[in-house]
Amino acid sequence: MKNILALLPILLLLQFNAAGQDVIRLQSCTDSLISRQVDSLKALYEKDGHILLKEASITMESEYEMPVVVPLSQGARYQFVFIGEYTSRLYEVRMFDWNEKQVVFQQKKWGDVDGNIISFAYIAPQSEFHMMKPLQINKKKKKNLCGYVMLFKKVN
């Protein structure tokens, strides 16, 4: 009985500590402009011999990266696409390999022709997980920004 009473305060402390930590939760979003761009890009890449491996709409906060982890196979050709909300001023995507070495960095600004879309090709030098970190900066809207990520693989 004494052991149970001694263990109770420790369990309570662990519960409060775990509940107090901030956690990034993936939440989907809907934006009609982004949906049209997604449909157009899917058709374009599928026509070019790509298959869609993963896609997700994500609710983002201005100036905060949203990590996306994907397994990539050695020698395969991939196309990564990030679409940000058109009212944002800056868009970035950084990609890191398993050793946390940055292997891709792209940035677009609002005034660019295709400013809210970042797309890049990548051939994985070895089979391992990679992390993409899309980010967008919006001066007026700080929370609930809509973003969309897609990963395609070239099949022919």
Task: Name each model-derived stretch.
Residues T87-V103:
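Short, surface-exposed beta-strand/strand-loop-strand elements in extracellular ectodomains
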Residues Q21-Y45, M95, Q126-N156:
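C-terminal edge strands of extracellular/lumenal beta-sandwich accessory domains
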Residues G49-S73, R77-Q79:
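Non-catalytic, beta-strand-enriched accessory regions in extracellular/secretory proteins
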Residues M1-R25:
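Bacterial Sec-dependent N-terminal signal peptides
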Residues G84-E92, K139-K142:
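Extended, low-complexity, turn-rich repeat/linker tracts enriched in Gly/Pro/Ser/Thr and Asp/Glu
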Residues V104-D112:
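Solvent-exposed serine/threonine-rich low-complexity stretches and specific carbohydrate-binding patches
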Residues V70, D114-Q126:
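Beta-sandwich interaction modules
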Residues V70-L72, F82-Y86, A124:
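Non-cytosolic beta-sheet module surface loops
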